[in-house]
Amino acid sequence: MAIKTYKPYTPSRRYITGLSSEDITAKPSVRSLLVKLPVHAGRNSYGRITSRHKEAGAKKLYRIIDFKRRKFGIEGKVEAIEYDPYRNCRIALIAYKDGEKRYILQPRGLSVGDIVAAAESGLDIKPGNAMKLKNIPVGTIVHNVELKPGKGGQMIRSAGAYAQLMGKEEKYVILRLASGEMRQVLAECMASIGEVGNEEWANVTIGKAGRNRHRGIRPQTRGSAMNPVDHPHGGGEGKKNSGRHPVTPWGKPTKGAKTRRKKASDKLIISRRKGK
């Protein structure tokens, strides 16, 4: 998939880049798989902002994605590759032999006309197929990995994401994530073969504020540009620094301070991700 550049007929247009849509099939989405999600724009049930820098963004419909991949024993044909406004990868429309249609994440290399299937074991190792981790060969690249059997894929779903199956130990398998983290996942969990497509997304330049507004992202004001009443970094004459380590508007350390709470799943992480 190619990166598009644009002629600079306005100053903001000069630095914008986008993705070519040549891989997208020119046909409407399946209406039964579209749903309107409520817009919260970072507000809670009282209307108060609980998550800053969010807004509604452009109008869009949510595509119902099959993350579980538990339609065993029935082959499906890729009918279309579509754009999904709620995620940065493409989605593939699968038409199964029993007449049902479902959307799945498009792995790299999957195109219109290909045949995909899901089963507990015994499938070819090719992009788009899904099996239980215990039956996938060591060394295979996977995505859309479950953390609890039957719950549906929760990990490795964004554009260009992947993990490699490194080994098997009793009821667990070992995955190496793109970040370098090594972690155990239950061998009964499902995973899809291949790397998530649209890997060029990481090279796209937003280019102007308006594109982020369309995505539902509002501007972020620096704490040092505020008054002392609004932020611990506020106040002072000119561009004076705050004189303290960086903190959030509520005084908690940020910019490098560890904030992750200990969780029960920590024991499944063999080695942490590598710092960049």
UniProtKB/Swiss-Prot annotation:
Pfam families assigned: Ribosomal_L2, Ribosomal_L2_C
GO cellular component terms listed in the entry, alphabetical order: large ribosomal subunit
Biased composition (Basic residues): 255-276
InterPro entries with a match to the protein in the record: NA-bd_OB-fold, Rib_uL2_dom2, Ribosomal_uL2, Ribosomal_uL2_bac/org-type, Ribosomal_uL2_C, Ribosomal_uL2_CS, Ribosomal_uL2_dom3, Ribosomal_uL2_RNA-bd_dom
Chain spans, region Disordered: 210-276
Any one GO molecular-function label of the UniProt entry: transferase activity
Cross-referenced SUPFAM superfamilies: Nucleic acid-binding proteins, Translation proteins SH3-like domain
Positions in coiled-coil regions: none
Any Gene Ontology biological process: cytoplasmic translation
Keywords, ordered alphabetically: Ribonucleoprotein, Ribosomal protein, RNA-binding, rRNA-binding
Compositionally biased tracts (Basic and acidic residues): 230-240
Domain of life, per lineage: Bacteria
Assembly mode: Part of the 50S ribosomal subunit. Forms a bridge to the 30S subunit in the 70S ribosome.
Function: One of the primary rRNA binding proteins. Required for association of the 30S and 50S subunits to form the 70S ribosome, for tRNA binding and peptide bond formation. It has been suggested to have peptidyltransferase activity; this is somewhat controversial. Makes several contacts with the 16S rRNA in the 70S ribosome.
Similarity comment text for this entry: Belongs to the universal ribosomal protein uL2 family.
Protein name according to UniProt: Large ribosomal subunit protein uL2
